[in-house]
Swiss-Prot record:
Transmembrane segments: 60-80, 87-107
UniProt KW keywords: Endoplasmic reticulum, Membrane, Transmembrane, Transmembrane helix
Predominant place of localization: endoplasmic reticulum
Subcellular location: Endoplasmic reticulum membrane
Function text: Component of the signal peptidase complex (SPC) which catalyzes the cleavage of N-terminal signal sequences from nascent proteins as they are translocated into the lumen of the endoplasmic reticulum. Enhances the enzymatic activity of SPC and facilitates the interactions between different components of the translocation site.
Superkingdom in the source lineage: Eukaryota
Family in the record: Belongs to the SPCS2 family.
Complex formation: Component of the signal peptidase complex paralog A (SPC-A) composed of a catalytic subunit sec11a and three accessory subunits spcs1, spcs2 and spcs3. Component of the signal peptidase complex paralog C (SPC-C) composed of a catalytic subunit sec11c and three accessory subunits spcs1, spcs2 and spcs3. The complex induces a local thinning of the ER membrane which is used to measure the length of the signal peptide (SP) h-region of protein substrates. This ensures the selectivity of the complex towards h-regions shorter than 18-20 amino acids.
PANTHER family xrefs: MICROSOMAL SIGNAL PEPTIDASE 25 KDA SUBUNIT, SIGNAL PEPTIDASE COMPLEX SUBUNIT 2
Protein name: Signal peptidase complex subunit 2
Lumenal side: 81-86
Length: 201
């Protein structure tokens, strides 16, 4: 595993409740979540981008509608005991599972593996916001973490991607502590490659 580096520069920012990010190295979900959170912090804190919650809001709306159908079925069955409530229950059950199907499609094809949507405001306030996406993957029983950065021009809507795939051992020390001064440069390198390409066009 990587040796833990010094606490200088940006490293002091990468804390959760003023404690280093420490996880169980054998818990794939915890490893992925800690790396995702750290990558998110780079864009939001270092580059001062503004997070957009549109994807999360969409999922919450679908889940809320599903819950409404479930609550209506429960209340209606209480006020009008079965079999009188049968037609309404049937409609609510069908609607609930329909919404669950929509949620599955939404998370699979809209959200995908995106965990951050961030906006970069135009300093002059003339052009639409540039949009940055972060998405990642870490397969079960695999040590290869893939981080993908997507840039969408607010002006031209052109889209460009950059990604890296590296072993998680590069970013955690023997105690399971995330070494931000090793991880942050990798994230910044992806971001800067897209930002530099944008300036040269």
């Amino acid at each position: 595993m990587a040796a833990r580096g010094g606490k200088n520069g940006l490293l002091e920012k990468w804390k959760i409740d003023d404690k280093p990010v420490k996880i169980d190295k054998w818990d794939g979900s915890a490893v992925k979540n800690s790396l995702d959170d750290a990558a998110k912090k780079v864009l939001l804190e270092k580059y001062r981008y503004v997070e957009n919650f549109c994807l999360i809001d969409g999922r919450l709306i679908i889940c809320t509608i599903s819950c409404v159908f479930a609550i209506v079925a429960l209340v209606w069955d209480y006020l009008h005991p079965f079999p009188e409530s049968k037609p309404v229950l049937a409609i609510c059950v069908i609607s609930y599972f329909l919404m669950m199907g929509i949620l599955t499609i939404y998370t699979s094809y809209k959200e995908k593996s995106i965990f951050l949507v961030a906006h970069r405001k135009d300093p002059a306030g003339m052009d639409p916001d540039d949009i940055w996406h972060l998405s990642s993957s870490l397969k079960r029983f695999d040590d290869k973490y893939t981080l993908k950065v997507t840039y969408i021009s607010g002006k031209t809507k052109a889209q460009r991607d950059a990604e890296f795939t590296k072993s998680i051992a590069r970013f955690f020390d023997d105690n399971g502590t995330l070494v931000m001064d090793l991880f942050e440069p990798e994230v910044s390198k992806l971001h800067d490659s897209l930002a530099m390409e944008k300036k040269t066009k």
